[in-house]
Design a protein with these regions (language model features):
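Extracytoplasmic "Venus flytrap"
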Residues: 27-41, 64-65, 150-157
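Sec-dependent signal peptide recognition
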Residues: 2-7
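Hinge/capping helix and adjacent helix->loop/strand transition within the periplasmic-binding protein
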Residues: 75-81, 96-183
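Residue-level signal for nonpolar/aromatic packing positions in well-ordered secondary structure
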Residues: 25, 34, 41, 58, ...
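Short, hydrophobic alpha-helical packing/hinge segments within bilobed ligand-binding/sensory domains
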Residues: 67-70, 184-185
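N-terminal signal peptide c-region/cleavage motif recognized by signal peptidases
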Residues: 14-16
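Paired acidic/hydrophobic, glycine-rich loop segments that form the ligand-binding mouth/hinge
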Residues: 80-86, 148, 194-196
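Short, polar/charged alpha-helical segment
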Residues: 37-53, 159-167
């Protein structure tokens, strides 16, 4: 992790020597506000402003498993003033799940850095009777297809992780796709869904 941060710091130092940015930089998040990718972008924005100067603005362009925002960035001028802050979904998963995406993930983007690496974790509301992974598996086996699992959308990494979990544990649940991670957390904390 230290090497990654040093590489980012070195890249930012070199970038500032090139008099960039010379206009506001739009950091497009292809998901709704409140999810993890949005929070990462909003955490990076003031740090980038302090390090390189200029104005950085987060613009959420959600929809279609993140492909709307990614497509907007792919169509933007290649001048370094429009950046995509995303998870792997729109660039790795969506091209394989959707019939067509409005970009070529390998050709239409210059990949700059991995800002964060975060595992998918299984969470339940604090009031849930399930206090361990073993509890969740036992419930799934005792009452197949009853537990609801909220994801940030069809084809998202958390959706695919849930499907893999059910496959590997020989269980099943009810997938409840949301339009982003923010709404998932709201309903999870409110008890509208059993897990995420």
């Amino acid at each position: 992790m230290k090497k990654l941060l040093c590489a980012v710091a070195a890249a930012l130092t070199m970038t500032s020597a090139l008099a960039w940015p010379d206009k506001p930089v739009t950091m497009v998040v292809p998901f709704p506000p409140g999810g993890s990718t949005d929070l990462i972008a909003r955490t990076l924005t003031p740090k980038l402003q302090d390090k390189v100067g200029g104005t950085f603005v987060v613009d959420n362009k959600a929809g279609a498993t993140g492909t709307i925002g990614a497509g907007a960035v792919a169509r933007s001028p290649a001048d370094g003033h429009t950046l995509l802050v995303t998870s792997l979904g729109p660039l790795v998963i969506a091209p394989h799940l959707l019939a067509k995406v409005p970009y070529d993930a390998l050709k239409d983007f210059d990949y700059l850095t991995v800002a964060v690496q975060a595992p998918n974790v299984l969470v339940v509301p604090a009031a849930s009777p399930h206090k361990s992974l073993a509890d969740v598996i036992a419930f799934h086996k005792a009452q197949p297809g009853k537990m609801t699992f909220a994801s940030s959308g069809n084809g998202s990494s958390d959706h695919l992780t849930a499907e893999l979990f059910w496959q590997q544990t020989n269980t099943s649940g009810v997938h409840v796709p949301y339009r982003g991670g923010g709404p998932v957390m709201t309903d999870l904390l409110g008890g509208q869904v059993d897990a995420s």
